Structures are given as structure tokens and as C-alpha cells.
Amino acid sequence: MRFRYFFWAGALLPLAPALAQTSAPAAAGLGMPPARPAPPPQVLRMTVAPDGSGDYRTIQEAVNASRDLSQVTVTILIKPGTYREKLVVPAHKTHVTLVGEDARTTIITGADHTGDAAGHNTYSSQTVLVQATDFTAENLTFENAAGPVGQAVALHVDGDRATFRRCRMLGNQDTLFPAVEGSRQYYQDCYIEGTTDFIFGTATAVFDRCEIRSKRNSYIAAAATTERQAYGFVFRDCRLTADTAAHKVFLGRPWRPHARTVYLRCELGAHILPAGWDNWRDAANERTATYAEYKSTGPGAAPAARVPWSHQLSAQEAKRYTLARIFGGTTTWQPLE
């Protein structure tokens, strides 16, 4: 034991000065972590231009370049042009904001549709798919240019806390798909057009000061609200207009039995049928769907002629339709009105 003790002691003595001069990487091997390199700077603003004058030529390239799971807003400025893309904002690309210069000159377009050669269906035909939370779009057009060929979605939104301002959604059947339960979506000063069920889905969505334009005789809203949801589609201070080909249009019909759709202070054109609502060929839906109006105006406003299973809200009932209440959920969210 004495031999071993002096052996180790002798070995340690000459090593002491060396230890004092050990570099950081060597020290890490002794339990001291090396200093981490500084993270690369986070790019919070990018520009897309089809002529190559921006950071990227396509919107998808810019989205792909944004930081994953960002906790701050990443703004992508989009120059005027027609962008022929099947754009996806995946779930890990959070807090992305797309800003165009003018919705009429900044257009994202596609033409996929149910039954096309690629085998698309309603759930894959969209031109733009938003899966990420905290997404915002301003001054953009989302278009499905397939024409009247069946289901052809322009914009499909799954993510929570999605906001669209001064945007246009162009298409025919199934133009706008606020898709899933638990998703809260806000549309302000937007233009939305279509033919059959052109605003449809399960999400909770509010439409403020939007123009809702029917292109032919059919149905506007096809909510699929679940019985767990207190709110479905809420239209506030909107204008319901129509092409000359549309003169018999329903406010909505229930895609699922517990559909909820409410119009508050909306101006209804003459194309809206006096009955107002359709039961989708199932009388049982009349007992479960919630369809209501408050202070509708215009030639399409006919409260006395509405189907008996719909409702005309009182002033007190209408007060419940605030953004704070509608978007309450498990986490608070109140977009700027």
C-alpha cells in the first residue's frame, strides 16, 4: 500500500502545473462544460419576389427558411405576382405572418380538385394549407381556379389562432375550410366567394365586416360544429352579395348535426331565401343545429318567414358574441378588432 501511495503521489505532482493550464475543451472532459457557441441570428423578416429581387422567389421557400417553433413573429413580405404554389405552413413553423402589398395583385393559386388526375379529394385539394399556430395573412388572395368541378378548396386552416385581414378567398365549391375542432380563426375585411358550402368545417371562426358572395343557387355555410363547442361560425356586420346567377341561396345547412352558425347585424341581399336555413334532408338536424340571426337588414332579411327551428336573438343574447367569449377556450386569445 505504501508503494501504491507514493506512485500516485509522484505521478500527480508533475501533473499539477499542466492541469492549471488545461484548455476549455480538455476541461470539459473533467466535468466542466465548454462554452456554447452563440446561436445564429434569427431572421425575422424576409421578402419574396417572383423576379428574384427578394430573398426568395417562392413563398414556400421563405416559410421553410423561417425558424422552427418560433416564439416571435416571422414576417414574410410578398411582392405582387401570381404564385402558382401548393403552399404548406407546417405545424412547426409557428408565428408566421404573410403580408402582401395588395390582395388583388398578390395571388396564390392552384387548381387541384376532387377527382382530378392526381386523385385529390376535399382534404387534399387545397391551394394553401395552414397547420401552424399563430398564423397571420394580410392583403393576399387564396385561389382555387379549378372551376365548377366539385370540391376544390382554396384555403384549408387547421392551426389555432389564425388571423386573416383584407384577404380574398376565391373558388367555387368548398372555397374556405376552417377545418378542425379546437382551431380558432378570425377573418376581418375579407372577400369570400363560392357556390356550394363554400365556408365549411368544424373550427370556431368569426367573420367581421366581410363580403360573402354567392356565385350560384346553393348554400353559404356548412358548419360541422361538435356538441362540445359553444360557438361555430359567427358572421358580424358582413355583407351577403351575389352574382346574377344566384337568386336562391340558403344562409347555411348542417354538415354535422350540432352545427352552429349565427349572423349578427348582417346585410342580406335579395338572393337569400325567406326560409333562410336548410336541414340537409334530415329533420333530426332541426333539433340539434343552432341557427340564429340578430338585426339582419336588406331585402334578404325576413325574420317572420324563417324556418321555425331557427332563432332571432334578443339584444341580451347577442351580447354573448364577443371575441373574448367566442375565442375563450382553454387559453385566452383576442385578436385586434
Predicted regions and their residues:
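Bacterial N-terminal signal peptides that target proteins for export
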Residues: 1-8
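Bacterial N-terminal signal peptides
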Residues: 8-18
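Sequence-level preference for short, compositionally simple segments enriched
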Residues: 21-337
